[in-house]
Amino acid sequence: MEFLDIFNEGKQYRKEFYSLYQEAFPEAEKKPEALMEALTAQGKMEMLAIAEEERFIGLVINMLAKKAALLDYFAISPDIRSGGYGGRAIQKLLERFQGQKYIFEIEMQDETAPNAEDRRRRKKFYLRNGLKETGILANVYQTDFELLTPDGELTYEEYTDTLRAVLGEEGVRVLAPSLIREK
């Protein structure tokens, strides 16, 4: 399994990458492709195809700051989900960012949400694959998130500093992050 930049060595997967991005994430949570491409050109984001044996498996989009990285989007192709690819990809990502702060945003658990079961399943998946709760809940772009890291250590300030380093003050203003709870 390898991660390939869709603008360089992974350009043959670009069409599948964007197709999965459009399909896998709610409209309200998607960033404009032009913004992500601009951030990638600036070295503040990476857009990676997950491939194995020359087959497209999924996508990873990371925000990159000097002191931390943030997993912005992660998806496995629907036709191969539950095949162990997601867990293997997460393990490789954790190895890749070992020794660096690596932040994961997951939708906050909410039994009344229409996708409550999906949220439960996603959280179990991430915890099973080595992530830990930080105790931080934040509202970002009108969505409630729980923040996870490999070591369970994070402050809300580190989180917002990471967003600011990647998106700038204007981007943070648009996202309008607010703290719901910190441990």
Show which residues each predicted segment covers.
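Short amphipathic alpha-helix that is part of the acyltransferase structural core
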Residues: 1-32, 146, 151-165, 172-182
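Active-site rim helix/loop that mediates acceptor-substrate recognition in acyltransferases
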Residues: 22-52
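Short hydrophobic/aromatic beta-strand element in the GNAT-like acyltransferase core
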Residues: 45-49, 59, 145-147
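Conserved beta-strand in the GNAT
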Residues: 49, 55-63, 70-75
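Conserved acetyl-CoA binding element of GNAT-fold acetyltransferases
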Residues: 67-78, 105-107
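Conserved acetyl-CoA-binding loop-helix of GNAT-fold acetyltransferases
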Residues: 76, 82-96
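Conserved GNAT acetyl-CoA-binding A-motif
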Residues: 97-118
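Conserved catalytic-core motifs of GNAT/GCN5-like acyltransferases
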Residues: 114-116, 121-145
